[in-house]
Amino acid sequence: MERAIFAGGCFWCMVQPFEELDGIESVLSGYTGGHVENPTYKEVCSKTTGHTEAVEIIFNPEKISYADLVELYWAQTDPTDAFGQFEDRGDNYRPVIFYENEEQRQIAQKSKDKLQASGRFDRPIVTSIEPADTFYPAEDYHQAFYRTNPARYALSSARRHAFLEENWH
């Protein structure tokens, strides 16, 4: 098994697209990239921890490639917005591909360059590609939020879904 960590705004919206794929062992919502150990949701939302909401994906590379996961990642985000995603603003919601090793870094960078060259967006692709750090799982009530709180999930993801429909589908 291998690990991928992606930040694309609110972690609630980043679970379902990956969780439903063959070859995915688990998808956890959590926090990474900051300087506070074992942060809470409240602490991360205070924007004082340096952490970003993210998902940790454990996958079987014999069934799905890291490159495939990166391609799906792009289609869940607005890669031209460095200051958050959709309804969620600030560094704790910034888009980041966190890489585990040089191979993942190269795959992510090549994919980002390809997206920039495609002309799909008229603004620069600003999603960061950064080395992975400790991943701290979020509190239980955040896990698989789309299943446990479908009405709240639908409300919180409306702008995201409209953007994705217009720009990716």
Swiss-Prot record:
GO terms for biological process? protein modification process
One Gene Ontology MF term: L-methionine:thioredoxin-disulfide S-oxidoreductase activity
Mind listing the UniProt keywords for this protein, alphabetically?
A: Oxidoreductase
Q: Which InterPro entries match?
A: Met_Sox_Rdtase_MsrA_dom (IPR002569), Met_Sox_Rdtase_MsrA_sf (IPR036509)
Known catalytic reactions: L-methionyl-[protein] + [thioredoxin]-disulfide + H2O = L-methionyl-(S)-S-oxide-[protein] + [thioredoxin]-dithiol; [thioredoxin]-disulfide + L-methionine + H2O = L-methionine (S)-S-oxide + [thioredoxin]-dithiol
Pfam families named in the record: PMSR
Its Enzyme Commission number(s) read: 1.8.4.11
How is this protein named in the record? Peptide methionine sulfoxide reductase MsrA
Q: Which gene encodes it?
A: msrA
